[in-house]
């Protein structure tokens, strides 16, 4: 697969599957999902995230460390503070698709309109 192309999902190596699973674990914590969602609107500092999300600043910092380690967010120093943002549009798309899928299920829609099972 080249960057930007469609991956061949049938041919995931064990290493790729492990890496994808680690990335998807970021979405297993509601606090991290909320942080990613907020950063999807625009970059901001730890203090801003803490205030806007109603979280303790140390908790936000801890979650940002996890998200940085997974390559989902980046930080840039601005004077005495770090400003965080999404790594790239892939992260925004991943979160958007997860939210869309969850909402789809919540509404009880069995199959997305136009969706078809793909033959093996």
Indicate where each model-derived feature is located.
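Intrinsic disorder/low-complexity segments enriched in polar/small residues
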Residues: 58, 63-64, 117-119
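Hydrophobic side chains within alpha-helical segments
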Residues: 35, 65-66
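N-terminal helix-turn-helix DNA-binding core of bacterial DNA-binding proteins
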Residues: 14, 18-58, 78, 82-91
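Amphipathic alpha-helical dimerization/coiled-coil segments
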Residues: 1-15, 19, 90-120
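Alpha-helical residues within the helix-turn-helix
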Residues: 51, 62, 68-69
């Amino acid at each position: 697969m080249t960057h930007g192309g469609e991956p061949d999902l049938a041919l995931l190596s064990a290493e790729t599957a492990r890496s994808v699973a680690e990335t998807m674990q970021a979405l297993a914590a509601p606090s991290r999902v909320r942080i990613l969602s907020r950063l999807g609107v625009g970059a901001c500092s730890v203090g801003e995230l803490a205030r806007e999300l109603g979280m303790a600043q140390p908790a936000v910092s801890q979650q940002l460390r996890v998200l940085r380690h997974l390559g989902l967010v980046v930080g840039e120093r601005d004077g005495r503070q770090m400003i965080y943002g999404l790594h790239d549009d892939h992260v925004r798309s991943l979160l958007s698709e997860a939210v869309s899928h969850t909402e789809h299920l919540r509404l009880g829609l069995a199959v997305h309109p136009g969706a078809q099972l793909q033959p093996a």
